[in-house]
Amino acid sequence: MKTNIITKIKILIKATNIFKNWYLYPFVYFKILRRDYVIFETYSGLKIKLRTRSTDLMALTNVWLVEEYSNFRINDKDVIIDIGAHIGLFTLYASQYCTNGIIFCFEPVEENYSVLLDNITQNNLKNVKPFKSAVSKSESTIAIYRNKDEASHSMFDPTSHALKVDSISLKRIIDENS
């Protein structure tokens, strides 16, 4: 998605209102930062770890700055199922509103799952239950086709490298947690 300069400036301004260390945003965006990871801290105290040499910043921008989920009504006692949780950006966003409910997050790819666990742990999110698993129509081992950006893996794109992962059915998730 091409973004014009005005939109980019608005996004940076929004970052100054959400993140205490917003000044790191352009360093990650322009790939100037020499670290593998960065942790953004919100004014509300959430810490968000992401990889600097990936599309994690784009995902952070979509969830936290563009606010793709702002029209979702998330209530205090909701049960949320985050399928393809990636590094937990939506999970962290939802955790601000769903404080007495439960958030189940499913991420089958080890590199993403590891950062997801870090994000859950460093924020002491007791109501978040992570699973290193894909979600599909049945209990099985399935192929996930890896995308080089670590954010767009798919069960339906056989043009890229396949990774075999465990899968749980949505029916089982609901049956076991109802």
Question: Which residues fall in each region the model found?
Answer:
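Phosphate/nucleotide-binding beta-alpha loop and adjacent structural elements of enzyme active sites
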Residues: 1-178
